[in-house]
């Protein structure tokens, strides 16, 4: 079975408003892809999650509840994505195992977060591991992995290829300090390493990137393997 998992960052799904144009274009692109048995799609929370969390934090709402709110925001975005796809689940799974079971019934299975402490990148990697996918595509708001956050340092350099250990090391370095911005969390990268899942980190808004990866195994972002 040839399957791929795609992680769509919340920043490209839910910006100032829900990015319906992207959802439609992305779904149309997947519908035209041949040679694959199924796609797992994991969706982030984006502006919807950030708005709820930042507003409620002012009222000292505890972190566990904020985590649950963030998770439910990802599931709302996931449900919105399903409306643009055919042969897709209508109920959003709450666990990776449930999502994997749905792959037997649908070509596309869309989900959000699962539990506090797990980012949607980690969920996507666990999903990929569970369904024996060789590839996870991480659609982000930047066009790959950089030595530093390119939005803060114009001298940051993009990395075309890196191994798992170097990616984990960079993730740790990026997670230190105020206002840190991590391209992928350590847990997701560690799962990829143990299962040999190749990661493509790309600008998720560029539809051609998905096509190049799925047909040619190439991208203009960063490949981690």
Curated annotation (Swiss-Prot):
Disulphide connectivity of cysteines: none
Chief place where the protein resides: cytoplasm
Top-level lineage group: Archaea
Regulation of this protein's activity per its record: Inhibited by UTP.
Pathway info: Pyrimidine metabolism; CTP biosynthesis via de novo pathway; UDP from UMP (UMPK route): step 1/1
EC number: 2.7.4.22
Compartment annotation: Cytoplasm
Membrane-crossing segments per the record: none
One GO term (biological process): UDP biosynthetic process
Chain positions recorded as ATP binding sites: 10-11, 46, 50, 140, 146, 149
GO cellular component: cytoplasm
The keyword Repeat appears for this protein: no
Top enzyme category: transferase
Binding positions for UMP per the UniProt entry: 45, 67, 114-120
GO molecular function terms attached to this record: ATP binding; UMP kinase activity
Keyword annotations: ATP-binding, Cytoplasm, Kinase, Nucleotide-binding, Pyrimidine biosynthesis, Transferase
The protein's assembly and partners: Homohexamer.
Stated family: Belongs to the UMP kinase family.
Protein name: Uridylate kinase
Species of provenance: Picrophilus torridus (strain ATCC 700027 / DSM 9790 / JCM 10055 / NBRC 100828 / KAW 2/3)
Lineage, highest ranks first: Archaea, Methanobacteriati, Thermoplasmatota, Thermoplasmata, Thermoplasmatales
Gene of this entry: pyrH
